[in-house]
Amino acid sequence: MSDAPAAADFKFSSKEIVDEASGLKIKASEPKPAGKLFDDSAALNVPRPKMYWWLPPNLSTGYGRKIDQLFYLILWITSVIFVGVQGALLLFLFRYRARPGAKATYTHGNNRLEIIWTVTPAIILVFLTILSQNVWSQIKGSSPSGAIPIEIHAEQFAWNVQYPGPDGKFNTADDIKTINQLHIPVGKPVRVRLTSIGKDGKHPVLHSFFLPEFRLRQDVVPGMAIDVWFEAARTGQYEIACSQFCGLGHYRMRGYLSIHSQEGFEAWLKEQKA
């Protein structure tokens, strides 16, 4: 675990450069005098997830597809059960409705039926648990070898992003720091360490790091350093959202995830070191 830097260390403004390989417009960060940490107007320009059918498009080459498959499998199972139960209710309402001359019948239960509707859901739940555990292990297990290390320190109301410099170590003079701007190359795993540092390094609160298109959501808990990983399938610019209410400015705690070619990412790193 690394020591969380004070929020005052992160004072940056933005300028736009173009990734020549992909044509993607990305944000480069440069130091500026200490002032307002986050421009409210920037929240209006953050790309929103595009919804196709039930979910935004999956851009994760790792576990995103498996998460979607679980969602749809559970949706189909619960839909079949819902339709079956509602159909049975309607059938019984019609078949056993009150009619002139009809006598009510009484039953003390049916052991066979009791076993069936107890064991069947139990089998379904065990089956879903096994499938979910496999996906959970892939998400929460160790990140793939060669993953790019990045640290993100959450505060009210910004994502402070930190990359190691040429020495490969964090919290040294050559670190690269940005605010609300996460840059990664396409097709390469990224390991992100999440911490909550609080405003000006004081009174950290709970946040939640959310990348809808990558099926990644992780609570950022004060006092804990939590690792997550993901891998992008294509270039583009996407939203970094906080999905946990963290104060009155929660609505503007949004950032950019810029994904570009390996050449473009290296050009961006070079731009930061210049």
Which residues make up each language-model segment?
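Soluble extramembrane regions of membrane proteins in the secretory/endomembrane system
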Residues: 1-37
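Non-transmembrane, membrane-proximal soluble domains of secreted or membrane proteins
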Residues: 10, 37-73, 93-274
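A general, composition-driven signal for non-globular sequence regions
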Residues: 5, 19-21, 26, 60, ...
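Alpha-helical transmembrane segments
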Residues: 71-96
